[in-house]
Amino acid sequence: MNNMKKLWALLLALAMTFSLAACGGSSDEEAATVDQTTEEEVPGDTAPESDLAYVQDKGTLVIGITEFEPMDYQDADGNWIGFDADMAAAFAESLGVTPEFQIIDWDNKVMELDGKTIDVVWNGMTLTDEVTSAMDCSNAYCNNAQIVILPADVADQYPDAASMADLTFAVESGSAGQEQAEANGFTYTEVVDQATAVLEVASGTADAAIIDSLMAAAMVGEGTSYDQLTYTIELNSEEYGVGFRQGSDLVDLLNQFFVDSYADGTLMEIAETYGVQAAIIPQE
């Protein structure tokens, strides 16, 4: 009897041993399977989100602008017009979406772009190192310069930058005009946009302003609302481009749009409408 009990005990012990081994093997296999599955499911570097797909999905191209005649400004009915506005609208149409113009704080343009408050900065934007390092930009499409605005009755007293050392300037915050004020050691006050900078000079709050030459030609002098002002010396030469989010697939599409619209005459026709044809850079 005792022998039978011992035999049964031995058989039971062996059965438990095999059972545990089987369970252990199963766990190891499952762990290996999980590890293998995990490795297989880890994706590689994903491509950046397509801006084209993004704007087409929502149906709008939101264009960041400021009030900047002759590039972006409103007509009597409140519609946005200007060389940049018309080109932006045509580009949006080529994508099959609706253009939507959004006034921005120029100093925050990169933040607005990256935060997707806007999809593009298209507003006579100078291609500075700061801009091109923070955005992916189109090819240059327009020549420009930063130019000094003064009251016409004192302009002859300031023939060069050195003679302007004691003046107080108004400049758009974050603009190429501000860069030139700093580069020349001028005393300046930052304002919200270039139109306000001109207004500061007209009202006597500032002695002078630094704005884009294209805007100066449209806003200042005989036949304008600021016929008591004039523009004088150029402080630099520069080029305009259009800014997108880094990695955006819209950049190449816009460059091709520029080439096509230049070739078929559309670009120059729009430029002539707003008197900027002499500043256009050929798109080829």
What is each of the regions a protein language model found here?
Residues 19-34:
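Bacterial lipoprotein signal-peptidase II cleavage site
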Residues 143-150, 213, 217-259, 277-284:
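Periplasmic-binding protein-like
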Residues 150-168:
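Flexible hinge/capping segments at coil-to-helix
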Residues 93-94, 102-103, 107-120, 134-136, ...:
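Short helices/loops that flank or line small-molecule/ion binding pockets
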Residues 83, 101-112, 156, 173-176, ...:
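Short helix-initiation/N-cap motifs at beta->coil->alpha
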